[in-house]
Amino acid sequence: MADGKIVQCIGAVVDVEFPRNAMPKIYDALKMAGSELTLEVQQQLGDGIVRTIALGTSDGLRRGMIIQNTGNPITVPVGTATLGRIMDVLGNPIDECGPVSHERTASIHRKAPAYDELSPSQDLLETGIKVIDLVCPFAKGGKVGLFGGAGVGKTVNMMELINNIAKAHSGLSVFAGVGERTREGNDFYHEMADAKVVDLENPANSKVAMVYGQMNEPPGNRLRVALTGLTMAEAFRDEGKDVLFFVDNIYRFTLAGTEVSALLGRMPSAVGYQPTLAEEMGRLQERITSTKTGSITSIQAVYVPADDLTDPSPATTFAHLDSTVVLSRDIASLGIYPAVDPLDSTSRQLDPLVVGQDHYDTARAVQGTLQRYKELRDIIAILGMDELAPEDKLLVARARKMQRFLSQPFHVAEVFTGAPGKYVSLKDTIKGFKMIASGELDHLPEQAFYMVGTIEEAIEKAKKLN
């Protein structure tokens, strides 16, 4: 492979000149002689010059420095060697536990599986979170999005799902921290170690691999770190395993793409996003899929800028998901956590042919009651409860009980709530909401339903209140 030399360096964008007959291909990785820095080719400008993005700090780069073409895209370690380890976008370990002794590597750029290789599943994945299991159930091998603005609980919900699914799940998990806080990555690692999902003594016995590209890193790292995590998940899937793939946060992937696009001088599109937003998102999401060999179940946190679900970034993500869990600031302000909006959240699995008629009817009854309560709230605010018809008063009382029963203490929030976390089976969830909807519990006060697990706990709590 021919060497090139730097001809221009503006921030994270580095132009490199090569002999005209030896120009690198798009996405080829370039290495700097005597340095750890990697550049990734983004554009061919002609005359032997390629425009690259630095995957690391570009401090100290000068014109004339020698750059080596590797001839291949970025490759990262895959397989059991990655378990229990924290790696960066290039697959280098950042957990101070020595090198990753891998037997094989894989390119982070690859095509999505062909249509005839796909294997969609209709099996349900129980999460133990009442509101999710009832109104937006997850599918094994499906894609789930947790949508929410700043501070409504996306990361806490993600941690609880990891706690409930990954710990009980016999398969493997891959966690990609994309442009999130370093503190959260650190907390996650220690939490996994405490739960024995990460085995510090013998990392090969761990069940999770972690890839981090944090907020403070250059845009190139944040743009590619999701692909690094996905490549590791795909390798486990292709070995015939069932993999959980967690991404926190997919919006930062879009944002990094916007930064890179601006640095490369592309004309922005709506709201300043990159013109290639749909294509970049599609290329990532189409690879997160289950094949006849194994499955990838993906759970992605999606930040919603200014709580606007019509923003191009969350709107583009919506199209690729099987289940959407929408977190609402209005519900959080009532003190109801998880702050999932049961009227906005959707799932393709909520179909009587998939979940069964009993589950479907219960979920629709709950949504219908809450929708009617939402319509009556304006009348209550202006005229008061006394002006409502008797049947509407009864409906409002049931809706308020349902709303409170949708709250639940989380295991990961025990530290700051002081209440022990609860895992509620789907059978108990359906039973509880059926009893409220049928009017069996009309005599109990609504406070009894707040922050409990099963309906039996609510009945016990009501006795104590009386």
Curated annotation (Swiss-Prot):
Topology of this chain in the membrane: Peripheral membrane protein
E.C. number(s) listed in UniProt: 7.1.2.2
Catalytic activity: ATP + H2O + 4 H(+)(in) = ADP + phosphate + 5 H(+)(out)
Class of enzymatic activity (EC top level): translocase
Listed GO CC annotations: plasma membrane; proton-transporting ATP synthase complex
Keywords: ATP synthesis, ATP-binding, Cell inner membrane, Cell membrane, CF(1), Hydrogen ion transport, Ion transport, Membrane, Nucleotide-binding, Translocase, Transport
Chain sites annotated for binding ATP: 148-155
Domain of life per record: Bacteria
Predominant subcellular localization, coarse grouping: membrane
GO molecular function, one term: proton-transporting ATP synthase activity, rotational mechanism
Compartments where located: Cell inner membrane
Quaternary data: F-type ATPases have 2 components, CF(1) - the catalytic core - and CF(0) - the membrane proton channel. CF(1) has five subunits: alpha(3), beta(3), gamma(1), delta(1), epsilon(1). CF(0) has three main subunits: a(1), b(2) and c(9-12). The alpha and beta chains form an alternating ring which encloses part of the gamma chain. CF(1) is attached to CF(0) by a central stalk formed by the gamma and epsilon chains, while a peripheral stalk is formed by the delta and b chains.
UniProt xrefs under NCBIfam families: atpD
Family: Belongs to the ATPase alpha/beta chains family.
Physiological role: Produces ATP from ADP in the presence of a proton gradient across the membrane. The catalytic sites are hosted primarily by the beta subunits.
Protein known as: ATP synthase subunit beta
Record organism: Janthinobacterium sp. (strain Marseille) (Minibacterium massiliensis)
